[in-house]
Amino acid sequence: MELGPPLVLLLATVWHGQGAPVIEPSGPELVVEPGETVTLRCVSNGSVEWDGPISPYWTLDPESPGSTLTTRNATFKNTGTYRCTELEDPMAGSTTIHLYVKDPAHSWNLLAQEVTVVEGQEAVLPCLITDPALKDSVSLMREGGRQVLRKTVYFFSAWRGFIIRKAKVLDSNTYVCKTMVNGRESTSTGIWLKVNRVHPEPPQIKLEPSKLVRIRGEAAQIVCSATNAEVGFNVILKRGDTKLEIPLNSDFQDNYYKKVRALSLNAVDFQDAGIYSCVASNDVGTRTATMNFQVVESAYLNLTSEQSLLQEVSVGDSLILTVHADAYPSIQHYNWTYLGPFFEDQRKLEFITQRAIYRYTFKLFLNRVKASEAGQYFLMAQNKAGWNNLTFELTLRYPPEVSVTWMPVNGSDVLFCDVSGYPQPSVTWMECRGHTDRCDEAQALQVWNDTHPEVLSQKPFDKVIIQSQLPIGTLKHNMTYFCKTHNSVGNSSQYFRAVSLGQSKQLPDESLFTPVVVACMSVMSLLVLLLLLLLYKYKQKPKYQVRWKIIERYEGNSYTFIDPTQLPYNEKWEFPRNNLQFGKTLGAGAFGKVVEATAFGLGKEDAVLKVAVKMLKSTAHADEKEALMSELKIMSHLGQHENIVNLLGACTHGGPVLVITEYCCYGDLLNFLRRKAEAMLGPSLSPGQDSEGDSSYKNIHLEKKYVRRDSGFSSQGVDTYVEMRPVSTSSSDSFFKQDLDKEPSRPLELWDLLHFSSQVAQGMAFLASKNCIHRDVAARNVLLTSGHVAKIGDFGLARDIMNDSNYVVKGNARLPVKWMAPESILYCVYTVQSDVWSYGILLWEIFSLGLNPYPGILVNNKFYKLVKDGYQMAQPVFAPKNIYSIMQSCWDLEPTRRPTFQQICFLLQEQARLERRDQDYANLPSSGGSSGSDSGGGSSGGSSSEPEEESSSEHLACCEPGDIAQPLLQPNNYQFAC
């Protein structure tokens, strides 16, 4: 069934509409009490500017300069009208909000003590009432209690003050504003009004915007306006030397005559570009303003730097890396990244962004640079033109470090001078008589300049290590040999003294010495290699980490996440571990297990509740224990929601950490769908199926010899750590009997699939409202409980990530690549919008009844290119056209064009309502048909075609034993080793 035109129009407005800026909180007026914290936020498509009684009582948010105003202690002086204007688009206009700060002790807020106008103008006396309830009792008096002149025409505006129409010279005076508060008169201080006689001058002009860029075919507007106290003036708009014939609009505002010529272009072309001039003239003179209008073929994003991309500084110096970006449309995401090679002891990167019209300045601050901070620094930015980047290479300069050693070589004495530093130091040898600590060329008996020392090491961004040899034959009595080194950073030297022949040395027997040294060096080399191998294996071993991330703040694509270890833990969650009676192990993985348990007295003193308990292995490392504690803190921070697996309690004292969560009796959604698939053979819902598709679902159970543990809620029956592996037939049978006894035997309806989809979307909308990014949205991570309620969870403890084909090795992480958005795969960017992409894959899983996404496609470079080029899977068999449209919108390559979870909820609920009404509870068909061999991704339905199958073993992978037993992935950050 199709979405009606009104619904489509609504979505187009939500996703792509542009208009005036929006001020939050909404409403034309806001009334607060003194001392309250007030925050005004302006939401717009571009740069904004605030106008009103701002300084010094307000602060601008440094993380979003210009868009957010905050005052921590509101006073009557904050009363006034605040206007937010978008700088880059005059068509968008502006939005205002008026703030009242009710202060019984101060009924008036004066914005000025003196007002000067020209005769005939409107004179505004800016005494603002602080309480809107007092505006009915206001009055205006002259100083000394005298009445206002009878011929003076004035009125009161709560937003502006008292306004005198067409002020005359005789109106010059000091005025006071009065009102009644609780029966008493409250008077403002005086405002001096000075009315000057008119002096003719050229018109004042304004040309907006000051600069304009549009893509060919877009709309644009250029506004040329002029004002003057006299009506006799003219205004024209020119492009180059050509006068444009544009209608003239006239108005009279604030005692000034205003004339406007507005050029509106519905679809700009290259001939519309050029220099535009706004010219206004009268008998007194002429004023002119100009602006540049640029029309481009497509969106652009250019990154440049006035600095060299190859930077060299000394250790301990500070450096600012600056990049300028010229972009249209606005940049949506950006981030600075350190690309190595030294990843140990890295500080958090500090940077700021300065915005102007169509231009950005990104600055990265490197303060007191350490040796480990040398390397590549990468700025990545994105707008509708795509991604662009700029890379700086920072090399540190080191002064020379020198070491002199002696060693016999072939019976001859040789001195070795080992030097490290950058730039490569020069080496000079000197021989001086006697035992001395200093020697220069004047004192030296001999001087050798080694112009070609041996380079031992020359790694990028590191010191150069060289060695110079001085063969001297036989060491001379009472001589000192100096090795002096120098580079642009500094110099260093070391000496070697030769003593008398009788004392000099007892040279070891070279025939014995050399083999011993070689043997020792060989053993040491083997030990070092073994140590490096063990270290590499340890680094490659995945660690249990917290998957969910809470955003603290963001600017562009620069996210600051809350450190979960710093979140407070509320002791109200503490539950006596003695009140837990453990049952069978529900699932186990590399890091821990999930155990069924009965909790006595949880919530109520006499309550008995079945729960699921997460715990670590006894061999868990300290960082894994910290990760589980962080997960506990995040769950408590998020709060409760019907569609997430909620925290019920925890045991953190007197033993290992235990996290108590809700128990979900039907297991994970993926296996639930696969179990139900045998009864859903759907000729009425799945047109065009062929006979081959029958096998797609008949083989799903594979004689029930494999049991999935990835949800953490399947039955094993013994309280041991169980890896994800095939189990015996008897064990499998008991599992299906136990869980399927609780499952309703009726076949699924289309409404059920819509119900699951809507509930997951509601859970994701809740997480998004809490600034939480999930990063592994998939059917295997959704559990079902009583009433077929779907809950989103985090089950990393019950996963053997090393053996799950759904997770692909990328760098030092295992990633669910087929569920990931392109920006996450290619650029390590994770946002709520990337969760929306993953949700689209989950929808495909639901409406294909548990098939693996991208069937028949291996995860390799060809897969990455397909995703990057916009390839989309075909419409699943059981998905109505409108549901497939939602999937496609979730898979938009431009993240900002993807729907929000709130919009997805609305669409799914509307579809479910229509399904209830039109299908009259029609079940999915239960006999006779087949699902179609291409049900999960055959022909791509019009715009794209299915790629050629690369591996038969990958086709319909849900039918393979290894896939049925696949475990879930350890919760990690899912970031590449960038």
From Swiss-Prot:
What is the activity-regulation note?
Answer: Present in an inactive conformation in the absence of bound ligand. CSF1 or IL34 binding leads to dimerization and activation by autophosphorylation on tyrosine residues.
Would you say which domain of life the source belongs to?
Eukaryota
Q: Which residues carry this modification: Phosphotyrosine?
A: Y544, Y559, Y697, Y706, Y721, Y807, Y921, Y974
Topological category with respect to the lipid bilayer = Single-pass type I membrane protein
Q: Which PANTHER family match?
A: MACROPHAGE COLONY-STIMULATING FACTOR 1 RECEPTOR (PTHR24416:SF47), TYROSINE-PROTEIN KINASE RECEPTOR (PTHR24416)
**Ranges for region Disordered:** 921-957
Residues annotated with Phosphoserine modification: S711
One GO location term (cellular component): perikaryon
Q: What's the encoding gene here?
A: Csf1r
Q: How is it modified after translation?
A: Autophosphorylated in response to CSF1 or IL34 binding. Phosphorylation at Tyr-559 is important for normal down-regulation of signaling by ubiquitination, internalization and degradation. Phosphorylation at Tyr-559 and Tyr-807 is important for interaction with SRC family members, including FYN, YES1 and SRC, and for subsequent activation of these protein kinases. Phosphorylation at Tyr-697 and Tyr-921 is important for interaction with GRB2. Phosphorylation at Tyr-721 is important for interaction with PIK3R1. Phosphorylation at Tyr-721 and Tyr-807 is important for interaction with PLCG2.
Give the organism, scientific name: Rattus norvegicus (Rat)
Q: What is this protein called?
A: Macrophage colony-stimulating factor 1 receptor
One GO BP annotation is: negative regulation of platelet formation
| Keyword set includes Hydrolase | no
Where are the catalytic residues? D776 (proton acceptor)
* Regions of this protein lying in the Extracellular compartment: 20-515
Q: Which reaction equation describes what this protein catalyses?
A: L-tyrosyl-[protein] + ATP = O-phospho-L-tyrosyl-[protein] + ADP + H(+)
Subunit architecture: Monomer. Homodimer. Interacts with CSF1 and IL34. Interaction with dimeric CSF1 or IL34 leads to receptor homodimerization. Interacts with INPPL1/SHIP2 and THOC5. Interacts (tyrosine phosphorylated) with PLCG2 (via SH2 domain). Interacts (tyrosine phosphorylated) with PIK3R1 (via SH2 domain). Interacts (tyrosine phosphorylated) with FYN, YES1 and SRC (via SH2 domain). Interacts (tyrosine phosphorylated) with CBL, GRB2 and SLA2.
Classification via Pfam families:
ig, Ig_PDGFR_d4, PK_Tyr_Ser-Thr
